[in-house]
Amino acid sequence: MRKNIILITGASSGIGREFAMQLDPYFSNIDEIWLVARRKEKLAEVASSLQHKTRILAMDITKEAQLERLTDTLDDRKACIRMLINCAGYGLMGAFGPSKPDFRSEEDCPDGQLGMIRLNCEALTHITYRCLPYMAKGSRIIQLASSAAFLPQPYFAVYAATKAYVLSFSRALGEELKKKEIYVTSVCPGPVDTPFFETAEKTGTTLALKKYTMVSSERVVEQAIRDSYYKRTMSVCSMPIQAFQVLTKCVPHQMILNVMNYLKERE
């Protein structure tokens, strides 16, 4: 008999952890929640807080060999993925180029700009591709994008580009999977109060204005779960970010970029 599971990447902290916490009290038809991230001890802490039976998969999802292990485990457990939630990712702020830290080569800084592309784009695509055969009618995919996907972001260039990829890929995938009744929701929050900024601001600072729109991970996840339930293709939390989304559709991007650059220079 197949086991119904929820699979969450980036589950050790932040939004991924919050998804595990909020989904745990529901879904009596779910047999296990699978938690995926690199830090085993952090995953164990999350698992200990859940009532559902859990499976900890401590792995680096940018490594193909480790994704093979995930596929093998899905086969061994005869898993049916009812929800795939891709939250693994990170961002780095600051001017692009060899300034601080020194991105002289991929080898010098494996967790730098190229690392964002590998994790935010390649790994998300790869894990989605591998998980699709284990999904069934009514399954859900939730992909963590960002409001940064709506517009190019100076001094956040690579991160914004990776999230634009996630949004575009996920919307297209959702159209492909409609006939199978598998539904994809892209979550596009603005700044969220998580450890994300501890990493992001090691190389630069965000606009002070953005921090005034910061919301809790609880609020973002609650909205995302609701939007996924109603089969919505996008989940945009908070009125300021919803207004920003409309703005990026109505106003030429260059005009908005000029304002962003002006505000950055005045800080």
What residues fall within each predicted segment?
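The beta1-alpha1 cofactor-binding region of Rossmann-like NAD(H)/NADP(H)-dependent oxidoreductases
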Residues: 59-69
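Conserved mid-core segment of classical short-chain dehydrogenase/reductases
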Residues: 89-114, 155
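Active-site helix of classical SDR
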Residues: 128, 162
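Residue(s) in the substrate-gating loop at a strand-loop-helix junction
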Residues: 146
